[in-house]
Amino acid sequence: TWAVLSGAAPAKHAARAMSSVRAHLVRRASGVILLLTPPFDKTALDPGYIKGYIPGIRENGGQYTHAAAWVVLALTRQGSGDEAAELFHMLNPINHTRSASQVARYMTEPYAVAADVYDHPEHRGRGGLPITNTAPRIRHCPPCRSDRREARAGR
């Protein structure tokens, strides 16, 4: 996403980077946008504290919602507004708690944005702790801002 957000990469390279994000990090079926894949569990290399998390949990291959918001922002900067809106709705906790089975899986309040969402096979879709800076990160995504403008305009 930073290839797009920084403006430092040529458009061709930024488009390729976002194509890789779509192919490897966006998991529509489970409703998450992963921070990285594969998780650090089969390497002798030590990337630091994230290897201490179980694979698919938090920063070790789960959704880190701050970074997922940057994906949404990068898509809007590229002019992919419909896709950005789709992914934005994947970040909305309400959309993880629409049924009893979703509530049982998410295990986090539907009114609080989770800082992370797990992608571990045994815990896929479970929300982590709500961290105070996560919601403002989401709030500043363009799809959210356009929703607020439409609400104020009475649409």
Question: Where are the language model's segments positioned?
Answer:
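Acidic, mature catalytic/reactive cores of soluble proteins
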Residues: 1-155
